[in-house]
Amino acid sequence: MIVMKTTQDKVLSVLQSVSGIVERRHTVPILANVLIRKTGDSVQFTTSDLEIQIRTTAELEGDVGNFATTVGARKLIDILRTMPSDQMVALETSQNKVILRGGKSKFTLQTMPAEDFPLVQESPGFGPVFSVPQKTLKDLLGQVAFAMAVHDIRYYLNGILFVAEGKQLSLVATDGHRLAFASALLDIEVPRQEVILPRKTVIEMQRLLSDAEGVIEMQFANNQAKFSFGGMEFVTKLVEGKFPDYNRVIPKNHKNRITLGRLALLATLQRTAILTSDKFKGVRLNIEPGTLRVASNNAEQEEAVDELDIDYAGDNIEIGFNVTYLIDALSNMSQEMVKLELSDGNSSALFTIPENATFKYVVMPMRI
């Protein structure tokens, strides 16, 4: 049976979309494979790592019929990458193997039974379906994902909190030193739901989401989240645990406010970061009416000083930050202007977008 017969670029694109979670070698060997299921004239591709399952369906010609098998995902992708994008390729069945043909090339690959592939059992308790544009969720993830913890023993910090309530979707991430919050409007009103998506899920979704038109549909259950977009279905387990009360962390009523160009501040921080200590990455901000001075030094007694002219008439403030935390936030914003709010040199700082309440970034000061 010819399972599919089409151009290299069509097959490769579909395989790459589902194979980001696949490891070349796995303690469960079949999880290094992609499940290929032919039903009529449609071909369905499924991958899993037991935490995440990704599935997509494509029309790739070939014989009409029913067939299923699993084959090494990375091997298949590596072979296809060596062929021209307009090369006609065919995948055929041959007893317990599959044969991939392209031009004068022929590759015979081992398979494992489709019935042995561990499909995720979907939760019966999913809430209502709601949606936002694909690009909106991609932007929200970009605004907060950098603040996720990495391998923190507080496992609930190694991911992003999704909160759906009313007609608002809010995303929050924190590693205990900084916190990023971003929100957008939903298409319908929903009851309050909170889930924590694992770090790996977030990274994979950022890879898959595009700026293309179209929406992403979401559903949450107690132990799973499901996303449907661009012909793909993405099911993931959730992180258990109680996320910190982010509303208590976000400061209110700072008396000192500065609005300045995001790119100018980013460039200043990137320059002064060069001479920070490799270990602590500290920069010192001196803020006074009309001037923001950024300074850094290191163990070799080298020093960098840079200044920005600002429209500011508040208190004189000296405060230290991990420069990486500031650069991360500014690099993941797209707006021209940013607002910095401070109380004094010992309290957390708040970055927002002027006239926009959908993004907030809190960063703790550090002693320098």
Q: Language model features by range: what are they?
A:
Residues 1-368:
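Structural preference for solvent-exposed beta-strand-turn elements
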